[in-house]
């Protein structure tokens, strides 16, 4: 064995000393002084900012919501059972961010952007903070492009445009989710990205929705953000912001996005739970004072951007669940005042077989005709008027049997219009067929058809036009206007002659 020379050792030690770099990582560290119910109070983080992410000793993340004199109130984003008093908490200096990008399409993620569908990790195009300012006045453009839902009652009377916020409100089990799923399925081939945010739903329900969209071929352009009923309140609170953040990535690239929040009542309840645990003063219905801002800052991020910014859009369909049809409660009135209209679904109509159960009297779109094609505007005008007159007369007709001919004719027409507004679930209809269907009803072609036969008449008439007079439907599709009325009437008359009423 060769002997080690002392000069070699000394030169080696000198080299090591010269190359030594002392790296000191300075972090703000605080101590947990109280923990429970998903909330922790942390002492010693005076420099923490509102909305900042903190890291607990066991790796679980938390978000600062309360800044108090001697401690900060933190909501915990994960299991809080292992966190105990005396644990250390580090500041990260970062706010909450989620991954964005095309790779998220077709995937199911939680509000932190982590995949929960068992299909492996997701490559992303970077991260965006979940709280970002809404586009300003000059960055916006008025809503003028229709977003076809494929549902006759909505596209004709309560039209939705790209960049609009349209509230869907109703009791539980009135078909709110069905309306949203039909709308998502109808966006196939229309260059739209869809984001479905499930807030406080059962896991089985979310699994059914994923399967429904997959079967319809709609999952490939849809992202599902799911905060289920078993998730902690902060996850339910974050889910809608995660959804709109992912949507903004596409909007600012000039894309068009449909964002469905199902439903915001559960988000408000989760926020109320967090606020009460953080000892914030309660207001009406025990909601905190800033519950209006909770929803307004979310829904204001839906916009139609100006041409200078790429003319992209986010259309928001927020859901609110009412109790026994009470739309004058706190959260419903808040969201009605924030949105550009509401679609009111009614239990009585649903139980009477009128599905989708849209109450056309209480529903409204504040964008209106500017979100409709010319042909639909022409046929929808008489439809709204006739249905309003029918509703008025139907109330009186219950009391008296002696009705004059004009009143009887109105009631007859109204019954058939109500029947033609019915539609099967997951069966969205292209706009040209909607126009043909409503045209036949408002022009009196159905007046002598029994109500029970109206749906069959409609189905067979549309397939007749498809196979024998495709140029009429093609004209509506391409020019967005009605074809020559004489030709249209003659085609419907020709079909009607061959239509046999079953006795």
UniProtKB/Swiss-Prot annotation:
* Residues the record marks as site: Required for activity: 363
Q: What is its EC number?
A: 7.1.2.2
State the family it belongs to: Belongs to the ATPase alpha/beta chains family.
Q: Which enzyme class, named as a word?
A: translocase
Q: Know the name of this protein?
A: ATP synthase subunit alpha
Topology in the lipid bilayer: Peripheral membrane protein
| Localization terms from the record | Cell membrane
- PANTHER family (UniProt xref): ATP SYNTHASE SUBUNIT ALPHA, MITOCHONDRIAL
What subunit structure does UniProt give? Answer: F-type ATPases have 2 components, CF(1) - the catalytic core - and CF(0) - the membrane proton channel. CF(1) has five subunits: alpha(3), beta(3), gamma(1), delta(1), epsilon(1). CF(0) has three main subunits: a(1), b(2) and c(9-12). The alpha and beta chains form an alternating ring which encloses part of the gamma chain. CF(1) is attached to CF(0) by a central stalk formed by the gamma and epsilon chains, while a peripheral stalk is formed by the delta and b chains.
